[in-house]
């Protein structure tokens, strides 16, 4: 039974950060504190620019305390760290790219776990949906951005609870070869979307308050979701899950539109990305009113697919290729935006090829390249250009140091 509790807490930790190990700082037999995280910096060339940028560096503190009757209290705090300063290139995850503070919040939750009754946590944490799709998220430079995790133009998924969800109440447990997670996101908050690439929310809010027709106010209510993982054997895992919420879109014209945010899908994984030999993972999803295009316009419905094939050789060189597509087709914008031509097309599609050299499990030098095949065809060529800007081809060389 002790092994089950350890596996339960470990499963939660893996979902929190699949590439992060930890170092024990303190253990008195009752209380335990570990520190984890990594520093990643890279030189990237994309969008006609070359810069040194941060690679989603982070630091975390993991706390646990043994209680009576086989209960364990636990907590985690994680901050993003920006060791290189601000960047003008928005090439991947918008949440990470726009950060110019040295420290910023990524995760923070507290909870309780039992070897039989499972684990309950409260706070900002990886959503249940991430259990379904995280196994394709191993490129160090370019996320897939097709799995419905980093929603609202590549943000951190906090709004609808599919990424690092805000205000989540989550339950996890294991039964035999099955593990499952269920969650509720208790919140009511407003945010703003604008038909402009790379605009801050405060600037977008100002446009809304001034009555601009390129700005909308979104009222997002509570969400809920669940996921299940079936370990067929030591190599093969199957996943499935969903997430659902409700939102209201307010327009400066006075119009109010109520819609459901819904995503569901499944995934398959073979092997272990960090082990020698072959690794493969793929997932597919169908979503409605779940994400926005690269100009912040809510997408009516789309299909997303992510896949990754990797091989680690005996000489500790690891190669991989990833293919990702997020296809909304034409006439995909539900909002009556002034620039929403029904013939506009949205298809995010690209491949990533990478070579990693592992000095050891925690020290990696890498090169990754992205080739874009997206289709953002529009009669408005300036809009088409803006839509494709952050999807450009690119190449990056970096160093990844895990604590």
Residue ranges of each PLM-predicted region?
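Transmembrane beta-strands of outer-membrane beta-barrel pores
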Residues: 41-45, 79-83, 126-128, 175-177, ...
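Gram-negative bacterial Sec-dependent N-terminal signal peptides
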Residues: 1-23
């Amino acid at each position: 039974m002790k092994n089950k509790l350890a596996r339960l807490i470990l499963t939660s930790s893996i979902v929190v950060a699949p590439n992060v190990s930890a170092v024990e700082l303190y253990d008195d037999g009752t209380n335990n504190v570990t520190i984890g995280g990594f520093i990643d910096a890279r030189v990237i060339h994309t969008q006609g620019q070359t810069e040194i940028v941060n690679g989603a560096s982070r630091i975390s503190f993991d706390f646990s305390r043994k209680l009576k009757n086989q209960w364990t209290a636990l907590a985690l705090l994680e901050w993003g760290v920006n060791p290189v300063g601000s960047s003008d290139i928005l090439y991947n995850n918008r949440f990470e790219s726009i950060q110019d503070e040295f420290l910023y919040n990524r995760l923070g939750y507290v909870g309780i776990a039992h070897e039989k009754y499972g684990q309950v946590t409260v706070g900002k944490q990886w959503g249940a949906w991430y259990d379904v799709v995280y196994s394709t998220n191993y490129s160090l430079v370019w996320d897939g951005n097709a799995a419905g995790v980093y929603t609202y133009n590549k943000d951190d998924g906090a709004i609808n609870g599919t990424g690092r969800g805000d205000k989540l109440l989550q339950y996890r447990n294991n039964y035999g070869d099955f593990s499952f997670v269920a969650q509720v996101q208790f919140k009511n908050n407003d945010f703003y979307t604008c038909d402009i690439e790379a605009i801050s929310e405060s600037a977008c809010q100002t446009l809304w308050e001034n009555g601009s027709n390129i700005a909308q106010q979104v009222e997002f209510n509570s969400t809920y979701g669940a996921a299940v993982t079936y370990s067929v054997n030591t190599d093969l895992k199957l996943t499935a899950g969903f997430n659902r919420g409700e939102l209201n879109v307010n327009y400066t014209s006075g119009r109010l539109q109520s819609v459901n945010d819904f995503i569901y899908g499944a995934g398959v994984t073979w092997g272990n990305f960090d082990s020698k030999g072959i690794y493969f993972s793929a997932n597919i999803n169908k979503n409605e009113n779940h994400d926005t295009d690269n100009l912040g316009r809510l997408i009516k419905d789309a299909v997303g697919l992510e896949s990754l094939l990797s091989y680690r050789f005996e000489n500790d060189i690891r190669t991989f290729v990833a293919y990702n597509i997020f296809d909304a087709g034409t006439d995909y914008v539900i909002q009556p935006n002034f620039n929403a031509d029904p013939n506009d097309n949205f298809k995010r599609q690209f491949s990533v090829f990478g070579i990693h050299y592992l000095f050891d499990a925690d020290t990696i030098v890498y090169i990754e390249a992205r080739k874009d095949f997206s289709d953002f065809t529009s009669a408005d060529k300036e809009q088409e250009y803006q839509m494709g800007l952050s999807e450009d081809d690119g190449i990056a060389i970096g160093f990844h140091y895990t604590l």
